[in-house]
């Protein structure tokens, strides 16, 4: 799998960002617990279950992206960015449909990571097509 320096840098930024958001959820930091405080009442999923599942999905995303860099695995790269796309779309839905008031900084971060994911997926496809020509 051919990658550019920009693609590698974006992957590193993504790994750091998604890891930064996964760890508080998994270790139960107070701010993270508060962030998931109304899941049960709004959509019927216990707050802690929603928090842990989100944290695990984010951690898996980070691991896949690390593997895509260290093992140069195209499959890990694509799966990681597809998972990131779904996670960020879920995050945006959460901000607007579940939270009483969206936290705009989280919205901006989710949009930025979503743009990176789409860019990386499109970049992977275009590099693959160039390799086959």
Give the ranges of each region predicted by the language model.
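Membrane-interface extramembranous regions
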Residues: 1-133
């Amino acid at each position: 799998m051919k990658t550019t320096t920009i693609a590698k840098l974006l992957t590193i930024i993504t790994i750091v960002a998604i890891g930064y958001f996964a760890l508080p959820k998994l270790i139960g930091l107070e701010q993270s617990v508060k962030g998931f405080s109304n899941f049960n009442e709004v959509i019927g999923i216990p707050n802690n279950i929603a928090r842990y599942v989100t944290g695990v999905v984010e951690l898996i995303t980070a691991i896949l992206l690390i593997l895509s860099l260290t093992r140069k695995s195209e499959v890990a790269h694509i799966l990681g960015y597809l998972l990131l796309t779904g996670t960020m779309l879920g995050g945006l839905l959460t901000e607007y449909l579940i939270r009483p008031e969206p936290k705009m900084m989280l919205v901006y971060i989710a949009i930025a990571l979503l743009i990176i994911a789409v860019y990386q997926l499109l970049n992977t496809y275009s590099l693959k097509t160039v390799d086959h020509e």
